[in-house]
Amino acid sequence: AGLAIADWPLVIAADHSWYFKPDAGQLLGSPANEDATEPQDVQPEELDIALGMHRIEAATTLAVRPTRTWAGLRSFAPDGGLVGGWDPEAPGFFWLAGQGGYGIQTAPAMGAGCAALIQGRPLPDELARHGLTPALLSPARLRVAPR
């Protein structure tokens, strides 16, 4: 018999070396790798699949058997934080980037927050209550002052 996983939380290793979460009636797992690569149509690497399976199985009682595999490009800001806001030097350009390996988890909140910022409204109360501010998301925080 299968496990009742629908209500399981996102589970992530303390060192961020793997994670899994319920998704569409199955578990979505990842080795949480951050390999630098040029933009391209990335494909799942057999080594990454095996590494993710090994890490999850070593830390849990799960026996991982993939039914599908996929890969994707992820963007990371230099400070590791999410980026959402108007570019201070490119009028009309709005950044929504830096979701790294957390895009699946952060997309609903980032979508709501960035929609508000684009429309010139304050961040939704449920985001502001948790301390999120436009300044924390702003791409301006990443600008390096000229020397």
Predicted feature locations:
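Active-site lid/adjacent beta-loop-alpha segment flanking the redox-cofactor pocket in flavoenzymes
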Residues: 2-92
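C-terminal lid/capping helical subdomain adjacent to the catalytic/cofactor pocket in oxidative enzymes
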Residues: 89-147
